[in-house]
Regions:
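P-loop NTP-binding core
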Residues: 1-260
């Protein structure tokens, strides 16, 4: 399978974006895919979520400025077939620095070329910053599709409408003519509440088959796992959160195979 690049993105924080990037990456690796997690969020929560410490100079920052090769920034994790390009605080300056450069929206795409050409990974998941700044737009420009986590709350659909506008602009300007939403996953679902069920129904009515069947539940174990530097499948495999992300990985795999 040629390398597929998927950006995990939502400009609203606290919707399960990084949780989804980390756990989907781990669950795809667990079904024998070679996965690279590219952490572009300066908060570096995906980096610590797979057990790596924040290390000065470890991020993709200098590569995005045109210095070096992204392959040299890839670090192994304790989890088989899962590798990571870490993030750290220097990425905070990326939006300002990239804005001054030529082809400033294509820097991540250019950085990923040697990764794609190497054939080393079947899937690259990008954990985007919780914003629609230049770094996130770079991730969009480099991606084959977007995976959008939506929290089961009242304002869930606001995020997707803004995302659609940005997608349209990137397609129309030729930055990424084929970019589309790969899938939408509902997160923090609480089946006991009327609101959660109503929001899921509303999103499914609006977005149809783009919405994954799997919903990610609210889960204490899911919330605990990052503090131990482990994806949920390696922290508590028999939890509801692990079961949900394993099912999501199967759905993602089906879509990837169909898209070939």
């Amino acid at each position: 399978m040629p390398t597929k690049v998927i950006a995990v993105a939502n400009q609203k924080g606290g919707v399960g974006k990084t949780t989804t990037a980390v756990n989907l990456a781990a669950c795809l690796a667990a079904v024998d895919l070679r996965v690279l997690l590219l952490d572009l969020d300066p908060q570096a929560n995906a980096t610590s979520g797979v057990g790596l410490e924040k290390t000065e100079g470890a991020s993709a920052y200098r590569i995005l400025l045109g210095e070096g090769n992204l392959l040299d920034k890839i670090k192994p994790t304790a989890f088989e077939r899962l590798e990571v390009v870490p993030s750290e605080v220097d990425l905070c300056a990326a939006d300002l620095e990239l804005a001054r450069l030529d082809n400033h929206l294509l820097r991540v795409a250019e950085a990923l070329k040697p990764v794609r050409d190497s054939g080393r990974f079947e899937v690259v998941l990008i954990d985007c910053p919780p914003s629609l700044g230049i770094l996130t737009l770079n991730a969009f420009a480099a991606s084959d599709g977007l995976l959008v986590p939506l929290q089961c709350e009242y304002y869930a659909l606001e995020g997707i409408s803004m995302m659609n506008r940005i997608l349209g602009q990137l397609r129309e300007t030729g930055v990424n003519p084929r970019l589309d939403i790969f899938g939408v996953v509902m997160t923090m679902f609480d089946g006991r509440t009327k609101l959660s069920n109503e929001v899921v129904g509303e999103v499914r009515n609006l977005l149809g088959a783009r919405v994954f069947e799997t919903v990610i539940p609210r889960s204490t174990r899911l919330a605990e796992a990052p503090s131990f530097g482990k994806p949920i499948i390696h922290y508590d495999k028999y939890s509801s959160g692990s079961a949900a992300y394993e099912l999501l990985a199967q759905e993602v795999l089906q879509r990837l195979e169909t898209a070939q």
